[in-house]
Amino acid sequence: MSFASETKKELTNLEVKHCCLRAELSALLRMNGSLSFSGGRMTVDVQTENAAIARRIYMLLRKGYDVAVELFVRKKMRLKKNNVYIVRITDGAASLLRELYIWNGDFSFVHDISPELIKKKCCKRSYLRGAFLAGGSVNNPETSSYHLEIFSLYEEHNRSLCELMNSHFFLNAKTLERKKGFITYLKEAEKIAEFLNIIGAHQALLRFEDIRIVRDMRNSVNRLVNCETANLNKTIGAALRQVENIRYIDETIGLDSLPAKLREIAKLRIEHQDVTLKELGEMVAGGKISKSGINHRLRKIDEIAERLRAGKPVDFHKSL
């Protein structure tokens, strides 16, 4: 079972107060419901491939409203041939949609979120929970990128959803138009964790955070190793260049031509090619020399080698 499926399964087992029940149902019916008329009677079908969500919708309807509700199971005949669960509302459908602020009763639908539904903080959380159950998905935190999104068919609802997430919970949600609708999405791991907490997915939150901590620690270690490797490669490259320059000087004019301070460092570098500048400074006979002091002398040796290669004269008095 995917992380998103486990999260939704957890949410379908939560207890809910009546005011919150209305907010959650409003999101579920608005986003997954369809309306039809037959013989002057309105019917609402709420369709999902998730059995737990279908049971949740059925339970919320039976618990909170006096409506005729049925549950059907059908099998898809194409692609994956999964079961499709349909919660059908017949008697009382019109009054239910009005109470959930989905339908005005004048054959026009309300696509944004009514303030009447989300007066309380708990109801705001419940609406987001219903929206996630109806059209949400979240990446497994072990994958390469963090991503949570909620799909809406209508732009007005998508905009209202994003506003709810940002103005009341400061989630830094963004919106995006897709081919068949719109999404509100989160990309920051901290905000996704906050969202899971807001909608009551506490077990999913704990798993998300556990995986995120391990992943972040692994990434930190990898960055540290990469940094150390880069520094080591840089040090080795510099040492090899220094040795090459010293040997070139030795072959052309001889190391004895160098001033004493440079000659000493040149010989130490040839003898100890794998040590750091700090370690090299501790080997100087006249006393310890700082890393910057050793680096200064080696740069002077590099300059002498470059002038010799270019056929230019070398002023050893300026090389100290």
UniProtKB/Swiss-Prot annotation:
GO biological process: cell division; regulation of sporulation
InterPro entries linked to this entry: Homing_endonucl, Sporu_reg_WhiA_N_dom, Sporulation_regulator_WhiA, Sporulation_regulator_WhiA_C, WhiA_LAGLIDADG_dom
Key word Cell cycle present: yes
PANTHER family named among the record's database cross-references: CELL DIVISION PROTEIN WHIA-RELATED
Gene3D superfamilies: Homing endonucleases (3.10.28.10)
Family: Belongs to the WhiA family.
Role: Involved in cell division and chromosome segregation.
Keyword rRNA-binding: no
Keyword line: Cell cycle, Cell division, DNA-binding
GO molecular function: DNA binding
DNA-binding region: 276-310
This protein's name: Probable cell division protein WhiA
Higher taxonomy: Bacteria, Bacillati, Bacillota, Bacilli, Bacillales
